[in-house]
Amino acid sequence: MTEKGLTYADAGVNRERHYELVRRIAAHTARTLRRPGTLGNIGAFGGLFQLDPARYPEPVLVSGTDGVGTKLRLAFLSGRHDTVGIDLVAMSVNDILCQGAEPLFFLDYIGIGQKDLAVLEQVVKGIADGCLQAGCALIGGETAELPGMYPPGEYDLAGFAVGIVNRDRLLTGEKVAPGDALVGLASSGLHANGYSLARRVLLKVDGGAFDLDDRPPELGGRTVLEVMLTPTRIYVRTVLRLLARFDVHGIANITGGGLHENIPRMLPEGTAAVLRRGAWKEPPVFDLIRRLGPVAQAEMEATFNLGLGMVLAVPADQAEAVAAAARELGEEAWVVGEVAAAEPGGPRVVVRR
């Protein structure tokens, strides 16, 4: 008689479901592994990547890690999981781009109470799509089945990106100076920040104004869900080309903390950014939040990107050319302000009408 005892599956961890997930996501990850430098396949203990010393004689590796935050709640509520993976990649690769780094590879972590194969395949497909947009390889990851840790239908995501830049091309913000112009690249909307406030204002289920499928006139025929699930724009291909053509002094990725917290991260001490409100196009979702909250303008600026996904500091005599080149590469772009000397004790970011 075979002894029958308690199994891992009895405790909520199903090995067969894990093996089936690996089979399902293999085709998605394989799409990203064509990137030069990638070695081996998914499934080894470590992901492998070989640097090219000819391209980078003095290589500096730049790393970044992030998540998607409460934007995931939109995926849970709607059952649409194929875009939050793009957000996951965007949050890290856009960060390392601010140091001038070309993304090389990406790894992901997914924590979930019970593996739902259809949901997880959608998530990984989105991660692979994001890696393709960023030109990096998805060389590894972890999907942890954690019974009792997450409510049914929910999960959390974390991502980790590594990029490379030659030492003489590293962006530290040291070159940014008063008189530099600021060029803004358009966001695709909310990106993946400020969602706790946005949900509180917009979503009826969280105490706000609308159902997911409502179409407020301000949103131009789009549903609230479509606007709030729009993935974060990945700027890698555009910005790497701008870096090759122009003397970019600094880059700020406008994420959590909005304009006021992120632009100063590229500014030397004693300098401030002066933005001209109205110089760029603000997506209508922001005015909807501002009006319905109501949310004060200062709070909006300290929470959201307000339509500026990335801001570049460049010499004033190159600003219009940089904006035009970005538009040729498919971005909406504007000259949105300048760098000035900071007032003693004054703000590092000033938004003027």
Curated annotation (Swiss-Prot):
Residue runs in coiled coils: none
Its cellular-component GO annotations read: cytosol
E.C. number, please?
A: 6.3.3.1
Domain of life, source organism = Bacteria
Q: Where in the cell is it found?
A: Cytoplasm
| Gene Ontology biological process terms from the UniProt entry | 'de novo' IMP biosynthetic process; adenine biosynthetic process
List the GO molecular function terms: ATP binding; phosphoribosylamine-glycine ligase activity; phosphoribosylformylglycinamidine cyclo-ligase activity
Presence of keyword Ligase:
yes
Q: Which Pfam families match?
A: AIRS, AIRS_C
Could you tell me which InterPro entries the record lists for this protein?
A: PurM-like_C_dom, PurM-like_C_sf, PurM-like_N, PurM-like_N_sf, PurM_cligase
The pathway this protein participates in, as annotated, is: Purine metabolism; IMP biosynthesis via de novo pathway; 5-amino-1-(5-phospho-D-ribosyl)imidazole from N(2)-formyl-N(1)-(5-phospho-D-ribosyl)glycinamide: step 2/2
* Keyword annotations: ATP-binding, Cytoplasm, Ligase, Nucleotide-binding, Purine biosynthesis
Q: Name the chemical reaction catalysed here.
A: 2-formamido-N(1)-(5-O-phospho-beta-D-ribosyl)acetamidine + ATP = 5-amino-1-(5-phospho-beta-D-ribosyl)imidazole + ADP + phosphate + H(+)
Main EC class the enzyme belongs to: ligase
Q: Which family does it belong to?
A: Belongs to the AIR synthase family.
HAMAP family found in the cross-reference section: AIRS
- Mind telling me what this protein is named? Phosphoribosylformylglycinamidine cyclo-ligase
Species assigned in the record: Symbiobacterium thermophilum (strain DSM 24528 / JCM 14929 / IAM 14863 / T)
Q: What is the lineage of its organism?
A: Bacteria, Bacillati, Bacillota, Clostridia, Eubacteriales
The coding gene here is purM
